[in-house]
Amino acid sequence: MIEHDVKNLSLAAEGRLKIEWAEQSMPVLRQVRERFTHEQPLKGIRIGACLHVTTETAVLMLTLKAGGAQLALCASNPLSTQDDTAAALVREYEIATFAHKGEDNDRYYRHITSVLGARPQVTMDDGADLISQIHGARKDLIGDVIGGTEETTTGVIRLRAMEREGVLAFPVIAVNDADTKHLFDNRYGTGQSTIDGILRATNILLAGRTVVVAGYGMCGRGVAARAKGLGAHVIVTEIEPMRALEAVMDGFQVMPMAKAAPLGDVFVTVTGNTSVLSSDQFGQLKDGAILCNSGHFNVEIDLVTLGAMARARRTVRPFVEEFVLDRGQRVYVLGEGRLINLAAAEGHPASVMDMSFANQALSAEYMVEHGRTLAKKVFVVPREIDLEIARLKLGSMGVAIDELTKAQREYLASWTHGT
């Protein structure tokens, strides 16, 4: 059997059914797979992927395999793995997979090491952990790598920092920055799946509660809109004036976190930064305040400080930990401060991941074809790929659009037409 470390191979049949279910909602990726099967653009290419091991990721892996790639996959978050999906990838599809839901940090990094043991020529990241390891403990692999792709905002931030410092050793495509990714996955996917995770973990009623959303990027906008749609009173906190202004114009209250802390019933961090909720806020929180994160790494809520401040802590439900502070107020942290939409729920719906993962597949193809001549920089997804994915998605939805007439094209190309 293919090399692997998954929790329970007996779950494979169940996982396959779920993968097939997700695939039905991923028509763009299915079309990419059909072409890949015929053209074999990834034939013999070793791809190492560190992604959330979900049914949607499985459909991406099958697409890459159909294109001829040799694959090794590990989880990009200790709590995001779907164990039945991981089992199916190994037993049903013979894809080397290293992922356990709830794995500790040691196992998490052992799994990354296992993927790097395949000596990938293309890396595929969600958070830049593979690339970080290659530039750290595994510099010996740099010569093998043609280039990489990065799925999420947090990873792109890390990679742009590496580029600025002149240490990025190969080109990387920022899949996150494609319009067909961040305008849909980040906003509609994160918005829906974050609320889904909160409700699955807590079974609370959001209507009438005050939800504080930290960060008003695409992910924060989605969370705020969905919370408002369920009847919550939404407060937004921001550090960037343009986004704060957008939040105000969208009808939300905007204020500093120091003012929001005593008002909120539920707090959702979606910033990609550290210590968004920290000791300055913990003492001001209401009794029963719920804290969760949807911004990738588990650093947005300062859990070390919260734990030190607590006189007692216990797990009260799956994915819900209670901290009792000095004056007796109870604070609840969901999913260990990790991505709540993947810790307590199933992540984004397949229909939105269809576009994100089509970007991944086509960016990998582009990197194989062009990566050896690209500078050691972070690149955006080529516009023609972005537009083709949008066209394919519209077609799969039965939506037709207009085209410019010859006269309209000439008008737009001319500078002589005025009032």
Language-model regions, residue ranges each:
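Short internal beta-strands
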Residues: 69-82, 235-237
